[in-house]
Protein backbone atom coordinates (compact mmCIF):
# COMPACT_ATOMS: atom_id res chain seq x y z
CA UNK A 1 0.00 0.00 0.00
CA UNK A 2 1.26 3.49 -0.88
CA UNK A 3 0.52 6.49 1.36
CA UNK A 4 0.00 9.97 -0.04
CA UNK A 5 1.91 12.53 2.01
CA UNK A 6 2.03 16.30 2.08
CA UNK A 7 5.67 16.76 3.13
CA UNK A 8 8.18 13.96 3.73
CA UNK A 9 11.42 14.85 5.50
CA UNK A 10 14.26 12.36 5.10
CA UNK A 11 16.47 12.58 8.19
CA UNK A 12 15.44 13.01 11.81
CA UNK A 13 18.31 15.04 13.22
CA UNK A 14 18.16 18.64 14.40
CA UNK A 15 17.83 19.99 10.84
CA UNK A 16 15.02 17.63 9.93
CA UNK A 17 13.04 18.18 13.11
CA UNK A 18 13.40 21.96 13.14
CA UNK A 19 12.34 22.06 9.49
CA UNK A 20 9.34 19.91 10.39
CA UNK A 21 8.43 22.35 13.15
CA UNK A 22 8.52 25.35 10.81
CA UNK A 23 6.39 23.62 8.19
CA UNK A 24 3.94 22.32 10.79
CA UNK A 25 3.52 25.82 12.23
CA UNK A 26 2.54 26.94 8.72
CA UNK A 27 -0.22 24.34 8.61
CA UNK A 28 1.46 21.60 6.61
CA UNK A 29 1.24 17.88 7.37
CA UNK A 30 4.74 16.52 7.97
CA UNK A 31 6.21 13.02 8.18
CA UNK A 32 9.84 12.38 9.18
CA UNK A 33 11.60 9.27 7.88
CA UNK A 34 14.90 7.99 9.28
CA UNK A 35 17.03 4.93 8.57
CA UNK A 36 17.81 4.58 12.28
CA UNK A 37 16.44 6.09 15.49
CA UNK A 38 15.48 9.76 15.49
CA UNK A 39 18.21 12.16 16.61
CA UNK A 40 21.01 9.62 17.00
CA UNK A 41 23.72 10.88 14.65
CA UNK A 42 25.72 14.12 14.58
CA UNK A 43 22.93 16.10 16.24
CA UNK A 44 23.08 13.88 19.34
CA UNK A 45 26.87 13.71 19.47
CA UNK A 46 27.68 17.42 19.35
CA UNK A 47 28.72 19.69 22.18
CA UNK A 48 25.91 22.22 21.97
CA UNK A 49 27.88 25.49 21.99
CA UNK A 50 25.56 28.08 20.47
CA UNK A 51 28.33 29.88 18.62
CA UNK A 52 30.69 28.68 15.90
CA UNK A 53 34.33 28.27 16.82
CA UNK A 54 35.91 31.66 15.98
CA UNK A 55 32.93 32.90 13.94
CA UNK A 56 34.90 35.93 12.71
CA UNK A 57 37.04 33.52 10.69
CA UNK A 58 33.99 31.99 8.99
CA UNK A 59 32.07 33.13 5.90
CA UNK A 60 29.40 35.78 6.45
CA UNK A 61 26.77 33.28 5.29
CA UNK A 62 27.42 31.27 8.47
CA UNK A 63 27.15 34.32 10.71
CA UNK A 64 23.85 35.34 9.12
CA UNK A 65 22.25 32.01 10.08
CA UNK A 66 23.92 31.99 13.50
CA UNK A 67 22.76 35.43 14.58
CA UNK A 68 19.19 34.81 13.44
CA UNK A 69 19.17 31.47 15.28
CA UNK A 70 20.51 33.02 18.48
CA UNK A 71 17.52 35.37 18.51
CA UNK A 72 15.18 32.37 18.25
CA UNK A 73 16.70 30.03 20.85
CA UNK A 74 15.39 31.45 24.15
CA UNK A 75 11.75 31.33 23.03
CA UNK A 76 12.21 28.02 21.19
CA UNK A 77 13.77 26.39 24.23
CA UNK A 78 11.04 27.64 26.55
CA UNK A 79 8.31 26.51 24.15
CA UNK A 80 9.80 23.03 23.89
CA UNK A 81 10.21 22.75 27.67
CA UNK A 82 6.65 23.94 28.33
CA UNK A 83 5.07 21.61 25.79
CA UNK A 84 7.21 18.51 26.25
CA UNK A 85 8.20 18.70 29.91
CA UNK A 86 11.80 18.00 28.84
CA UNK A 87 14.31 20.79 29.46
CA UNK A 88 16.67 21.33 26.48
CA UNK A 89 18.97 23.09 28.97
CA UNK A 90 19.44 26.28 27.01
CA UNK A 91 21.91 27.92 29.35
CA UNK A 92 23.67 31.29 28.77
CA UNK A 93 26.76 30.48 30.83
CA UNK A 94 29.18 32.54 28.69
CA UNK A 95 32.38 31.53 26.94
CA UNK A 96 36.04 32.35 27.52
CA UNK A 97 38.20 32.31 24.39
CA UNK A 98 41.81 31.89 25.50
CA UNK A 99 43.74 32.83 22.37
CA UNK A 100 42.82 35.66 20.04
CA UNK A 101 45.76 36.70 17.84
CA UNK A 102 43.16 38.34 15.57
CA UNK A 103 41.57 40.25 18.44
CA UNK A 104 40.60 43.27 16.33
CA UNK A 105 38.79 41.05 13.86
CA UNK A 106 37.03 39.36 16.78
CA UNK A 107 35.94 42.67 18.29
CA UNK A 108 34.77 44.00 14.93
CA UNK A 109 32.67 40.88 14.41
CA UNK A 110 31.14 41.10 17.87
CA UNK A 111 30.30 44.77 17.41
CA UNK A 112 28.80 44.31 13.96
CA UNK A 113 26.72 41.33 15.15
CA UNK A 114 25.77 42.91 18.50
CA UNK A 115 27.50 40.26 20.61
CA UNK A 116 28.72 41.58 23.96
CA UNK A 117 32.41 41.07 24.71
CA UNK A 118 34.90 42.01 27.43
CA UNK A 119 38.55 41.56 28.14
CA UNK A 120 38.69 38.43 30.27
CA UNK A 121 39.33 39.33 33.93
CA UNK A 122 42.39 37.81 35.60
CA UNK A 123 40.19 36.04 38.14
CA UNK A 124 38.79 33.94 35.30
CA UNK A 125 42.27 32.77 34.25
CA UNK A 126 43.96 31.79 37.50
CA UNK A 127 42.86 28.13 37.59
CA UNK A 128 43.74 27.51 33.94
CA UNK A 129 47.05 26.40 32.47
CA UNK A 130 47.57 27.68 28.93
CA UNK A 131 49.43 30.43 27.08
CA UNK A 132 46.84 33.17 26.96
CA UNK A 133 46.83 35.57 24.03
CA UNK A 134 44.41 38.48 24.48
CA UNK A 135 41.72 36.34 26.13
CA UNK A 136 38.16 37.37 25.34
CA UNK A 137 35.04 36.88 27.47
CA UNK A 138 31.66 36.57 25.74
CA UNK A 139 29.19 36.68 28.65
CA UNK A 140 25.96 35.96 26.76
CA UNK A 141 26.96 32.89 24.75
CA UNK A 142 24.71 29.95 25.57
CA UNK A 143 24.73 26.20 25.21
CA UNK A 144 22.07 23.56 24.76
CA UNK A 145 22.32 19.93 25.79
CA UNK A 146 22.02 18.08 22.50
CA UNK A 147 20.34 14.82 23.58
CA UNK A 148 17.77 16.65 25.69
CA UNK A 149 17.05 19.22 22.99
CA UNK A 150 16.44 16.43 20.49
CA UNK A 151 14.26 14.45 22.89
CA UNK A 152 12.28 17.56 23.76
CA UNK A 153 11.85 18.45 20.08
CA UNK A 154 10.69 14.95 19.13
CA UNK A 155 8.18 14.87 21.99
CA UNK A 156 6.87 18.30 21.01
CA UNK A 157 6.50 17.34 17.33
CA UNK A 158 4.74 14.10 18.23
CA UNK A 159 2.27 16.05 20.37
CA UNK A 160 1.68 18.41 17.44
CA UNK A 161 0.82 15.57 15.08
CA UNK A 162 4.06 15.18 13.14
CA UNK A 163 4.56 11.51 12.19
CA UNK A 164 7.84 9.63 12.69
CA UNK A 165 8.91 6.53 10.79
CA UNK A 166 12.14 5.10 12.23
CA UNK A 167 14.46 2.26 11.19
CA UNK A 168 13.18 2.41 7.61
CA UNK A 169 15.68 1.99 4.77
CA UNK A 170 14.83 3.40 1.36
CA UNK A 171 14.76 0.64 -1.28
CA UNK A 172 13.54 2.51 -4.37
CA UNK A 173 12.76 6.01 -5.64
CA UNK A 174 10.74 6.85 -8.75
CA UNK A 175 11.42 10.11 -10.62
CA UNK A 176 8.74 11.27 -13.07
CA UNK A 177 8.42 14.57 -14.95
CA UNK A 178 10.91 16.56 -12.83
CA UNK A 179 9.37 15.31 -9.61
CA UNK A 180 10.35 12.85 -6.94
CA UNK A 181 7.18 10.84 -7.43
CA UNK A 182 7.41 7.98 -4.93
CA UNK A 183 9.67 6.47 -2.29
CA UNK A 184 9.64 2.83 -1.28
CA UNK A 185 11.06 1.80 2.10
CA UNK A 186 11.44 -1.41 4.06
CA UNK A 187 8.29 -0.44 5.97
CA UNK A 188 6.02 1.35 3.52
CA UNK A 189 5.80 3.29 0.24
CA UNK A 190 4.99 7.00 -0.06
CA UNK A 191 3.99 9.54 -2.70
CA UNK A 192 4.90 12.92 -1.17
CA UNK A 193 3.90 16.29 -2.57
CA UNK A 194 7.20 17.69 -1.28
CA UNK A 195 10.33 15.90 -0.10
CA UNK A 196 12.98 17.55 2.07
CA UNK A 197 16.40 15.92 2.38
CA UNK A 198 18.04 16.51 5.79
CA UNK A 199 20.35 13.51 5.83
CA UNK A 200 23.44 15.19 7.29
CA UNK A 201 26.69 13.43 6.46
CA UNK A 202 24.76 10.90 4.34
CA UNK A 203 23.23 13.51 2.01
CA UNK A 204 25.78 13.17 -0.78
CA UNK A 205 25.60 9.37 -0.61
CA UNK A 206 21.82 9.56 -0.91
CA UNK A 207 22.02 11.75 -4.00
CA UNK A 208 24.66 9.57 -5.64
CA UNK A 209 22.64 6.43 -5.04
CA UNK A 210 19.17 7.64 -5.96
CA UNK A 211 19.73 10.61 -8.27
CA UNK A 212 22.97 9.77 -10.11
CA UNK A 213 22.00 11.51 -13.36
CA UNK A 214 21.18 14.93 -11.92
CA UNK A 215 23.19 18.02 -12.82
CA UNK A 216 24.69 18.54 -9.36
CA UNK A 217 26.36 16.41 -6.71
CA UNK A 218 26.74 18.18 -3.41
CA UNK A 219 30.10 18.06 -1.65
CA UNK A 220 29.14 16.91 1.85
CA UNK A 221 31.66 14.61 3.51
CA UNK A 222 31.56 12.85 6.89
CA UNK A 223 33.99 14.33 9.43
CA UNK A 224 34.37 12.34 12.62
CA UNK A 225 34.38 14.12 15.95
CA UNK A 226 35.14 12.42 19.27
CA UNK A 227 34.28 13.74 22.72
CA UNK A 228 34.82 12.90 26.38
CA UNK A 229 32.62 13.53 29.40
CA UNK A 230 34.05 14.03 32.90
CA UNK A 231 31.88 13.22 35.91
CA UNK A 232 32.79 16.44 37.69
CA UNK A 233 30.99 18.41 40.39
CA UNK A 234 28.83 21.48 39.66
CA UNK A 235 31.34 23.94 41.12
CA UNK A 236 34.26 22.81 38.92
CA UNK A 237 33.73 25.16 35.98
CA UNK A 238 31.07 27.90 35.63
CA UNK A 239 31.42 28.69 31.91
CA UNK A 240 32.58 27.32 28.56
CA UNK A 241 36.21 27.60 27.48
CA UNK A 242 37.66 27.57 23.96
CA UNK A 243 41.42 27.03 23.69
CA UNK A 244 42.72 26.74 20.12
CA UNK A 245 40.28 24.29 18.50
CA UNK A 246 39.30 22.40 21.65
CA UNK A 247 36.79 23.29 24.32
CA UNK A 248 35.29 22.52 27.71
CA UNK A 249 31.53 22.72 28.24
CA UNK A 250 30.11 22.49 31.79
CA UNK A 251 26.63 21.03 32.03
CA UNK A 252 24.22 22.13 34.72
CA UNK A 253 24.63 18.85 36.61
CA UNK A 254 28.40 19.40 36.85
CA UNK A 255 29.53 17.04 34.11
CA UNK A 256 32.11 18.60 31.79
CA UNK A 257 32.24 17.79 28.10
CA UNK A 258 35.57 17.91 26.26
CA UNK A 259 35.74 18.26 22.49
CA UNK A 260 36.61 17.59 19.92
CA UNK A 261 38.59 15.85 17.23
CA UNK A 262 38.25 16.62 13.51
CA UNK A 263 39.03 13.43 11.58
CA UNK A 264 38.67 12.23 8.01
CA UNK A 265 37.59 8.65 8.68
CA UNK A 266 34.79 8.09 6.20
CA UNK A 267 31.67 6.69 7.82
CA UNK A 268 33.61 4.99 10.65
CA UNK A 269 32.10 6.05 13.97
CA UNK A 270 34.30 4.01 16.29
CA UNK A 271 36.10 5.85 19.08
CA UNK A 272 39.88 5.55 19.32
CA UNK A 273 42.32 5.29 22.22
CA UNK A 274 44.45 8.04 20.67
CA UNK A 275 41.59 10.53 20.67
CA UNK A 276 40.70 9.61 24.24
CA UNK A 277 44.29 10.24 25.29
CA UNK A 278 44.57 13.53 23.36
CA UNK A 279 41.31 14.92 24.71
CA UNK A 280 42.13 13.83 28.25
CA UNK A 281 45.54 15.51 28.09
CA UNK A 282 44.05 18.72 26.70
CA UNK A 283 41.36 18.87 29.38
CA UNK A 284 43.53 18.06 32.39
CA UNK A 285 46.30 20.41 31.25
CA UNK A 286 43.93 23.33 30.69
CA UNK A 287 41.92 22.68 33.86
CA UNK A 288 44.08 20.63 36.28
CA UNK A 289 41.12 20.23 38.66
CA UNK A 290 39.70 17.68 36.21
CA UNK A 291 42.41 15.17 37.16
CA UNK A 292 40.42 14.20 40.24
CA UNK A 293 37.32 13.22 38.23
CA UNK A 294 36.70 10.08 36.17
CA UNK A 295 35.71 9.93 32.53
CA UNK A 296 32.13 8.70 32.35
CA UNK A 297 31.62 8.65 28.56
CA UNK A 298 33.52 8.70 25.26
CA UNK A 299 31.68 8.85 21.94
CA UNK A 300 31.98 9.82 18.29
CA UNK A 301 29.71 11.37 15.68
CA UNK A 302 29.92 12.18 11.98
CA UNK A 303 29.57 15.84 11.07
CA UNK A 304 28.33 16.81 7.60
CA UNK A 305 31.31 18.80 6.33
CA UNK A 306 31.27 21.11 3.30
CA UNK A 307 34.28 22.85 1.71
CA UNK A 308 33.49 26.22 3.35
CA UNK A 309 31.27 25.15 6.24
CA UNK A 310 28.30 26.82 4.56
CA UNK A 311 25.27 24.49 4.36
CA UNK A 312 23.13 23.76 1.34
CA UNK A 313 19.61 25.12 1.78
CA UNK A 314 17.21 25.28 -1.13
CA UNK A 315 15.53 23.45 -3.98
CA UNK A 316 17.25 20.86 -6.13
CA UNK A 317 17.68 22.40 -9.60
CA UNK A 318 16.45 19.29 -11.42
CA UNK A 319 13.49 18.27 -9.26
CA UNK A 320 10.67 20.68 -8.57
CA UNK A 321 9.53 19.06 -5.32
CA UNK A 322 12.87 18.17 -3.69
CA UNK A 323 14.63 20.57 -1.34
CA UNK A 324 17.68 20.14 0.88
CA UNK A 325 18.78 21.41 4.29
CA UNK A 326 22.16 19.80 5.04
CA UNK A 327 25.90 20.35 5.40
CA UNK A 328 26.12 22.38 8.61
CA UNK A 329 29.44 20.78 9.71
CA UNK A 330 30.05 21.69 13.39
CA UNK A 331 27.21 24.19 13.56
CA UNK A 332 24.02 22.21 13.08
CA UNK A 333 22.56 23.30 16.42
CA UNK A 334 23.55 26.94 16.26
CA UNK A 335 22.45 27.42 12.63
CA UNK A 336 19.48 25.06 12.91
CA UNK A 337 16.50 27.33 13.68
CA UNK A 338 17.34 29.93 11.02
CA UNK A 339 18.22 27.26 8.44
CA UNK A 340 14.86 25.59 9.00
CA UNK A 341 12.98 28.87 8.71
CA UNK A 342 14.84 29.80 5.52
CA UNK A 343 13.95 26.52 3.84
CA UNK A 344 10.36 26.77 5.03
CA UNK A 345 10.19 30.28 3.58
CA UNK A 346 11.33 28.93 0.21
CA UNK A 347 8.93 25.96 0.25
CA UNK A 348 5.99 28.11 1.35
CA UNK A 349 6.93 30.93 -1.05
CA UNK A 350 7.30 33.44 1.76
CA UNK A 351 9.81 36.29 1.58
CA UNK A 352 12.95 35.02 3.39
CA UNK A 353 14.52 37.10 6.13
CA UNK A 354 17.93 35.83 5.01
CA UNK A 355 19.13 36.04 1.41
CA UNK A 356 19.12 32.40 0.18
CA UNK A 357 21.68 32.84 -2.61
CA UNK A 358 24.75 31.83 -0.55
CA UNK A 359 23.15 28.47 0.34
CA UNK A 360 21.69 27.55 -3.05
CA UNK A 361 22.47 24.19 -4.64
CA UNK A 362 24.95 24.44 -7.48
Model-derived features: positions:
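N-terminal Rossmann-like FAD-binding beta1-loop-alpha1 element of flavoenzymes
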Residues: 5-31
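Short hydrophobic core segments
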Residues: 8-10, 190-202, 340
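Dinucleotide-binding Rossmann-like beta1-alpha1 core, especially the glycine-rich loop
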Residues: 49-126, 132-133, 282-284
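Short beta-strand to alpha-helix junction loop
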Residues: 64-67, 100-103, 136-155, 270-275, ...
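C-terminal catalytic lobe of FAD-dependent flavoproteins
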Residues: 289-362
Amino acid sequence: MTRDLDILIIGGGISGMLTARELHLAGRQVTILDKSAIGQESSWAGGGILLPIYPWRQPAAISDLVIESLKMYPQLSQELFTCSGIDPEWYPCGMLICKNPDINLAKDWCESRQIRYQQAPNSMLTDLDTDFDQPLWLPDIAQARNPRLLKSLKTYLTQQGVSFIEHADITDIVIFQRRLHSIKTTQQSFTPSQTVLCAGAWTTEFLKQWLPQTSIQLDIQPVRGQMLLFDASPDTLPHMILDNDHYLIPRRDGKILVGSTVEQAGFEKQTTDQARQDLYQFATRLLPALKQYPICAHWAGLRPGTPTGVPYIGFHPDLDNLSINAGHFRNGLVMGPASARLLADLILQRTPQINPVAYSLH
